[in-house]
């Protein structure tokens, strides 16, 4: 008996389709409910109106631009922080400008999937986008640090439903066999927001004001919102029209008890990571208490989710399926490595190599462009060959190699090498970026796709938040050791407080001092050590890829058109 059949027999919420792959049952289905060899999602796939031509382009452009703005907003603030803290005299609030955004986004992420599965996709998306735009406006007009933090929290709440909402819209607008291509375009272009943030933010801060780092979302966002208002957005499944009676009926199904347990647990974990080693020692009662509180709350949450079953915010039958959790691990490892690298490559190019913020952004283009090209190309190839697992494994393997060779960066690495190394790294990321999404879309019935995507994006963002902190710990600890070894006359506290710009590093030693090379080597080696972490993450994603299922998506596509 093969692996797929054994899995289907073990899980009462999984049915086997005639295409040969396991598929999670829809609401109310039990094992054995599928009496004929017909995929229950086939009818909805056949009956759903497919969008083509200019309307499809407009929908894809709208959600891609919205996701780009959302990811840009998460990375653009870094270069604006020095000016913000100077105006508000709020150096102690630096961590909260990022933390408020991530905490709010992480807390609402899983619930957003349940909301999409219950209400109109179009209006739910516009609701989350409106929250994001409102948060951007509050940040732009903020007259105090507290107001700015509040605006970041509102924007974070809005961002929780944008990336998964965009993929839900794409899933409803195009047939399954074309989703890899369109999802690749969507992810490839929107992910540019992560790496373009410092470049765009640096230009806006330098030539206008830091407030335009937030104002930029308003006019661009207005265009995308107006487009969506006048476009017909197909649904994955039929949904009733919005009424207050519908709200009263749906609210009990949203698992708000699960949300009230999950949100504090996620917030406590992230707060412990932000406080640990910064405001409080890692072994302090505050940090330990937060971790313990999070652990207890997660246990209670897991017990509650198990009790409510498929009505849960994160259905246990879904997340316990091998394809779902291995896809989540693979995707989380990839996205975490992207987010961490986006922080430390600029340190290498600005601090070690001496480039300004704008040229530092230009120097990362080899990785950005190769990632954009391969994420689209991999989607086309999956559509042709049908199997996503080889691309998931290859993407993680190439990413591991790319992160490994980046550890060879030094203050004197030739231009040809740092360009080539980034091309290898970007290619690996691009190849594997959308494979987890394809696996989940292929596995889940239409009514569960939004929940599955929301769960996966939560795992990616949560892993990113965790490993950004881990990367910071590694970098800081290594910098202390490296400064003592290569520039002993430089005070460690001064090096840690200097920042990572070209001028600040070179100000640590007198002009013409021979120890300047030691300072640059110390920072370069510290960045290299962070990429050892990213290499390990990529290897973890490589191992997880082999659990994502050897499934030919073309068989399902064929069955849905017969």
Swiss-Prot record:
Calbistrin A has been reported to possess a number of interesting bioactivities including antifungal active against Candida albicans and cytotoxic toward both healthy and leukemic human cells. It comes from the Eukaryota. Its main location: membrane. Disruption phenotype: Leads to an almost complete absence of calbistrin A and calbistrin C, and a decreased abundance of decumbenone A, B and C in the extracellular medium. Keywords: Cell membrane, Glycoprotein, Membrane, Transmembrane, Transmembrane helix. Induction: Expression is induced in complex medium (Czapek yeast autolysate medium) supporting calbistrin production. Expression is positively regulated by the calbistrin biosynthesis cluster-specific transcription factor calC. Residues 1-45 are annotated as: Disordered. Glycans are attached at residues 83, 557. PROSITE patterns: MFS. The keyword rRNA-binding does not apply. The chain crosses the membrane at residues 57-77, 94-113, 123-143, 154-174, 184-204, 213-233, 256-276, 284-304, 329-349, 362-382, 389-409, 418-438, 451-471, 530-550. It holds the Pfam family MFS_1. GO terms for molecular function: transmembrane transporter activity. Residues 1-16 have a biased composition (Polar residues). It is found in: Cell membrane. Belongs to the major facilitator superfamily. TCR/Tet family. This is MFS-type transporter calB. It comes from Penicillium decumbens.
